[in-house]
C-alpha cells in the first residue's frame, strides 16, 4: 500500500486536491473579510471585483506552486500554503490601511476598475515575494 502513495500520479492528485480545497477555504475567508459578496458581484458583471478576486486566486495558486515545489510532504505544503495565505491577507489589510482617502472595498464594490486592477497587481505581485521566501 505504501507504493500507492509514492506513485507520482497519486502525489500530483493529492497535491492538486489539497491545494484546491485550501483555495476554496481561503476564498471563503476573503469573502468574510470583504464588505461585498464576491460571487454575487461577479455574477452582476462587476469587473473590479472579478479582477480583485482573480488576483487573490492567482496569488494563492502561486504560493501553493512554490510550496509544492519546495517541500516533500502534504503537511509541509499545507503549512507553508497557510502561512503564505496569511501573508497575503495581511497585505490586503495593509492596502486598505495605506489608502485612507477612500475605502478599498467600497471602491471595488462600486466597480472602480482602477482599484480592482491595483488590488489584482498587489495580490499577484506580493505572492511572488511570499513564494520566494517559501
Swiss-Prot record:
The chain crosses the membrane at residues 10-30, 48-68, 78-98, 114-134. The keyword Ribonucleoprotein does not apply. Keywords: Cell membrane, Membrane, Transmembrane, Transmembrane helix. InterPro entries: DUF350 (IPR007140). It is found in: Cell membrane. The keyword Membrane applies. It is a multi-pass membrane protein. One of its GO terms (cellular component) is plasma membrane. Belongs to the UPF0719 family. This is UPF0719 transmembrane protein YshE. It comes from Bacillus subtilis (strain 168). The gene is yshE.
Amino acid at each position: 500500500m505504501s507504493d500507492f502513495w509514492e506513485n507520482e500520479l497519486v502525489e500530483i492528485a493529492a497535491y492538486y486536491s489539497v491545494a484546491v480545497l485550501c483555495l476554496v477555504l481561503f476564498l471563503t475567508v476573503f469573502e468574510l473579510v470583504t464588505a461585498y459578496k464576491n460571487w454575487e458581484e461577479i455574477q452582476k458583471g462587476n469587473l473590479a471585483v472579478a479582477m480583485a478576486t482573480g488576483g487573490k486566486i492567482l496569488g494563492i495558486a502561486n504560493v501553493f506552486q512554490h510550496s509544492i515545489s519546495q517541500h516533500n510532504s502534504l503537511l509541509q505544503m499545507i503549512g507553508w500554503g497557510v502561512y503564505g495565505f496569511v501573508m497575503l491577507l495581511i497585505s490586503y489589510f495593509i492596502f486598505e490601511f495605506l489608502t485612507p482617502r477612500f475605502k478599498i472595498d467600497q471602491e471595488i464594490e462600486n466597480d472602480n476598475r482602477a482599484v480592482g486592477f491595483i488590488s489584482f497587481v498587489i495580490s499577484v505581485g506580493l505572492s511572488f515575494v511570499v513564494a520566494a521566501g517559501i
